[in-house]
Amino acid sequence: MSNRRAHRIGLGLAALGRPAYLTGGRNHDLGDARSVEDMRTLTATVLDAAYAGGIRYVDAARSYGRAEEFLANWLNSRSDITDIEVASKWGYRYVGDWRMDSEVHEVKEHTLKAFTAQLRETRALLGERLDLYQVHSMTEDSPVLSDAQLQHALGELRDEGVGVGLSTSGPRQPEVIRAALALEVNGAPLFSSVQSTWNLLETSSGAALSEARDAGVSVVIKEVFANGRLAPGTTDASPGVRKALRLAAELQIPLDQLAIAAALQQPWKPRVLSGAVTTAQVHSHLAGTDIELPPHVAEELAGQSEEPVEYWAARSQREWS
């Protein structure tokens, strides 16, 4: 059964393409079944559930371990499926060597050389199925904002018919969004899509994302569950999480559905990424698309965000598991 607003949910593969990630609850969700074949099979199972539920947008990245490979395997095995929008990202490399205890899991490089190499790698796996290629986690110091040759190369990809987007992370997301959306190549905007972190605890990107929507740019939000802080089973005791838990209990819905419903009710109409790693999570996230939060709940939630610097500092301390 498809949910009413399933088309506004996308499936992100950050937590499926590699054995370790910084989202909480992975030991409960995955146990020890983390081999390449375990995760390949699980990815296909979750993709099947997402597609059956009406999800038509899938988001991968070069740094998400073998996510592009797993997605390509699934697409090749489902030749009947032609209506999936496929997005991926370049700018980080996965260096975790499929280990849970790797000291470093990914390395950032926003250079022309990295773009050229990673686009070649992505196309080797996804071929013509690639619809959107995003700069991964742009910050104010990203060379993308100043390197004319790199901008020109991205513009060439845009002119070939592949959408060019960016994702943002960190406490200065609004400034990065505005700077990126001001970029033009050959007289046309470079970016047609922006993906940013937005959730009940980190809302600072909201105004800039609203401006992006007004400019005709597609808006996608990630980490709507704050890497597990706003998911069922959370052990987070911060004021914002406690308030969200109380309101979810009042509405008799799970915390993840509250988080999704709040995101979907933003006036700039984002697409919301689910980071589901189980079919049960897919079903719960889709159920969240049918929930309309009462005005008093939306008002109470609006005042619970943390200072961006504090939010991102806490996120940087999360352990990969």
Task: Identify the residue ranges that each predicted region occupies.
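N-terminal binding-site loop/beta-alpha segment at the start of enzyme catalytic domains
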Residues: 1-85, 89
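Short, well-ordered coil/turn segments that N-cap beta-strands
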Residues: 5-9, 54-57, 80-84, 127-131, ...
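Short acidic/His/Gly/Ser-rich catalytic and metal-binding motifs that mark active-site loops
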Residues: 17-23, 94-99, 229-231
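Active-site mouth loops of central-metabolism enzymes
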Residues: 21-41, 100-116, 142
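Short, acidic/polar
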Residues: 35-49, 108-125, 172-184
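Structural motif corresponding to the early beta-alpha repeats
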Residues: 81-112
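Active-site groove signature of glycoside hydrolases
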Residues: 121-143
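Beta/alpha (TIM)-barrel catalytic core signal, keyed to glycine-rich beta->alpha loops juxtaposed to Asp/Glu
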Residues: 137-321
